[in-house]
Amino acid sequence: MVTQIISTMETQASNGPGSVGILNGTNGAADDSKTNLIVNYLPQNMTQEEFKSLFGSIGEIESCKLVRDKITGQSLGYGFVNYVDPNDADKAINTLNGLKLQTKTIKVSYARPSSASIRDANLYVSSLPKTMNQKEMEQLFSQYGRIITSRILVDQVTGSVSRGVGFIRFDKRIEAEEAIKGLNGQKPLGASEPITVKFANNPSQKTGQALLTHLYQTTARRYTGPLHHQTQRFRFSPITIDSVTNLAGVSLTGPTTAGWCIFVYNLSPEADESVLWQLFGPFGAVTNVKVIRDFTTNKCKGFGFVTMTNYDEAAMAIASLNGYRLGDRVLQVSFKTSKQHKA
């Protein structure tokens, strides 16, 4: 397999790299992380030896790790490579990013350093003009820094009309802070009222209860009763994120091409996509949400799906939201398995 991979790599290298790195990788990494790479969307049957051989063909590797599920031992579809020489890391990005392996197109980018400068850079924006699209929102915010992801919530019925609410994730917190200073309370072109720009609450802080209470209050018209966490039934340590699959009680099927699919159960009949966006958006980049509806009544059948691009953020969302009470219902949140309901 390795020989075929390297042959494919040499054929594709002349075409240049593929699309840019995803959320948890950036070509603007700090100097102390110029050798450390994250590799996403690897074929699930790829072994540690094949992974090392592929990236070892570029240059000397100090360490590499193919990340596996703690329970099943199956590859989670991503890994880390640390080169001795920064030039080799740069070459690996230019050569291997966008390489097609089997049915996958791998993404190679610098692993983002774990520092306060890149944490908590996710913004919640409301009262946007209904005519503003995602590109226009990015243009409005891009003057303050590099945007990693953005999303505007749309009406479920039309699938296109904006709800006037969006999320913007910057590369660095200081950029997000500047965006708040510059845009919060301002009226962009086409707006009938000032927009609100604020940080999406950080789930890693000791304010998880306040976060979900706030989220519940935003949807209070659809739900009744307070929001509570079932602390006696569901507990977790924020530092043991790898144990989330044990908490959820399921094994993973691995990421989809779009990211990690999360199953959300026990939603009320009145729940819609905006509820899922507001619940999961603050935890990280969400690429898609879907509430499963009854064809006759168009009411929620009690469950839905959320896709997030980053495993750690998805795991944190599960650990924080599994067992929380939304209205009079206790949510059950886990990674989607093949045995669960299908849309």
From Swiss-Prot:
Q: Family per UniProt?
A: Belongs to the RRM elav family.
A GO biological process of this protein is: nervous system development
Organism, by scientific name, is Xenopus tropicalis
List S-S links within the chain: none
Function text: RNA-binding protein that binds to AU-rich sequences (AREs) of target mRNAs. May also bind poly-A tracts via RRM 3. May be involved in neuronal differentiation and maintenance.
The answer to keyword Ribonucleoprotein applying to this record is: yes
Entry protein name:
ELAV-like protein 3
Record text about domains:
RRM 1 and RRM 2 bind cooperatively to AU-rich sequences in target mRNAs. RRM 3 binds to poly-A mRNA sequences.
Keyword Ribonucleoprotein annotated: yes
Q: Which SUPFAM superfamilies match?
A: RNA-binding domain, RBD
The record's section on CDD domains has:
RRM1_HuC (cd12772), RRM2_HuC (cd12776)
List the Pfam families.
RRM_1 (PF00076)
- Gene Ontology molecular functions: RNA binding
The UniProt keyword set, sorted, is: Developmental protein, Differentiation, Neurogenesis, Repeat, Ribonucleoprotein, RNA-binding
Per the record, the gene is elavl3
RRM domain residues: 35-113, 121-202, 260-338
Question: Would you name any one GO CC term?
Answer: ribonucleoprotein complex
